[in-house]
A protein has these predicted regions:
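Short acidic beta-strand-loop surface patches of small beta-rich interaction domains
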Residues: 242-257
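Conserved nucleotide-binding/hydrolysis micro-motifs of P-loop NTPases
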Residues: 1-4, 15, 99-103, 126-131, ...
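Loop/turn positions that initiate beta-strands
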Residues: 261-262
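Short, contiguous acidic and Ser/Thr-rich linear segments
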Residues: 208-223
Length: 270
């Protein structure tokens, strides 16, 4: 069994999915484009908008593949290559190389790094992360997900000690973490380009139960204070007056672009 084949299979299936959408009604589509003298970039972007394809993505793909001739003359092989380029641009992938503590896994991980250089590939052990969280849940250890160590705080039997020692030696010390939190962080903040935002007050960061900043909202990088207001509640957006950066205590306007981990207080008309 070669896990790299799984990656190739997934790529192929996605490429064929895109190709199937492109191929369906292609002759009719290109005939209309020619008859109405449409811009192929705009026409394709509109046709594939459900896949998050835009004009810029189409233009780049056409440029890479040097599809200078009319779309009516594009052959099946060229359409497959176009489908692949569009898939790469609209479906970024991260590979979670799970079971990294299994014998032989390190070799496969190194092979994957060499073969799939355009992907983020993270070594991880979901089983180790689960074991650590279960031990934490039962007050046996102190552990923060994503960190490279844990502290034993409870009574353990020999089997539990051996299991934790195995995780420490073969996962945490070898790869610096279990990889699970890193997979989530990379996927959300790098691939999807989200930022984390917290609603809070200049003079109050706790809720009625004493929890500090209990709520976190994920939004696209580039989101504004007004976007955040609408995300919290439509009425907040409609009645927006100003926002306050809680850390700096500076007043910011509706067009202020928010940064990752900003704490924002909103002022709205009642």
């Amino acid at each position: 069994y070669d896990p790299l084949k799984d990656i190739e299979f997934l790529e192929f299936e996605l490429d064929m999915w895109y190709f199937g959408i492109l191929k369906k009604g292609w002759e009719k589509f290109t005939r209309i484009v020619k008859q109405e003298n449409q811009d192929i970039k705009k026409a394709l972007a509109k046709q594939l908008s459900g896949l998050n394809v835009n004009e810029e993505i189409v233009q780049n793909a056409i440029k890479i593949l040097k599809l200078d001739h009319h779309p009516m003359q594009w052959n099946e092989d060229e359409l497959k290559k176009l489908a692949r380029e569009l898939r790469i641009a609209t479906k970024p992938m991260l590979i979670a190389a799970n079971k990294i503590d299994v014998p032989g896994a390190k070799l496969n991980f190194d092979r994957a790094l060499e073969k799939f250089k355009d992907y983020i590939i993270i070594p991880c052990s979901a089983e180790s992360e689960l074991a650590l969280k279960e031990a934490m849940k039962h007050n046996m250890i102190k552990y923060i997900p994503g960190e490279n160590n844990f502290e034993i705080t409870g009574k353990l039997n020999d089997k539990q000690k051996d299991a934790l020692e195995f995780i420490k030696k073969n996962v945490l010390q070898e790869y610096n973490n279990t990889g699970i939190q890193q997979v989530l962080d990379k996927a959300v903040f790098e691939l999807l380009d989200y930022i984390a935002l917290f609603p809070g007050g200049v003079n109050k960061l706790e809720d009625s139960e004493g929890r500090v900043l209990p709520d976190c909202f994920l939004m696209r990088n580039g989101s504004t204070a007004l976007d955040f207001a609408y995300r919290l509640h439509t009425d907040f957006g409609k009645n927006f007056i100003k926002a306050i950066d809680v850390r700096t205590k500076l007043i910011v306007g509706k067009d202020y672009k928010l940064k990752n981990k900003d704490i924002i207080e909103l002022a709205v008309r009642k």
